[in-house]
Amino acid sequence: MHEPVRDARRLPHEQVAPEVLLLRGRAAPTAALVAQIEAVARAAPFRQLRTPGGGTMSVAMTNCGTWGWHSDARGYRYVECDPLSGSAWPAMPAPFRELAAAAAAEAGFPGFEPDACLVNRYEVGAQMGAHRDFDELDMRHPIVSVSIGLPALFLWHGATRGGSPRRVALHDGDVLVWGGAARAGYHAVRRIAPPDLLAGAAPGGTRPLRYNLTFRRAR
């Protein structure tokens, strides 16, 4: 059964865990970001990747930037070209790069220069299991995660996958940043519920989706 996500958009920035900071509404309004996502997807369409174990991810993905994250039977890795087209990934839009750098600096990680942006598209019912971002060469760089559209319940597990995670309601325009000792922390996203079961809804009458921009320094 879906758990209700409370409206927390008016709360100040939150310290989720040591070196994990939630910047409430930092990316709002998000209409321009959605337009840029759609432009990226025209060049590199969303696709549901296969896991090394043979499963299919419920979240659809694409990338922009110098490097793109990819998964198939060979494993998880970064690639310079879109496997579907053989072409380079679309360039990262300047507003994406600027948002990521500014949010990282605000969270205490100045000088962040992302070279990869993984764009996740969550339909209603999609989820992301507990995992950690561990495919980058230099773990000294933070991760910047931008939420757009439908609300979601984010789970921060930390150093181990088990136990009782910290639950954080994410809304349109929220930005989550983590790095330092928390850089390899386990995290997850609960199954996205239909809008009528949530305290929030998709902004501006848009299609009921959640987008997530995950900025990393891959190389």
Regions found by a protein language model. Name each.
Residues M1-R219:
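Non-heme Fe(II) oxygenase metal-center motifs and adjacent flexible, charged/small-residue loops
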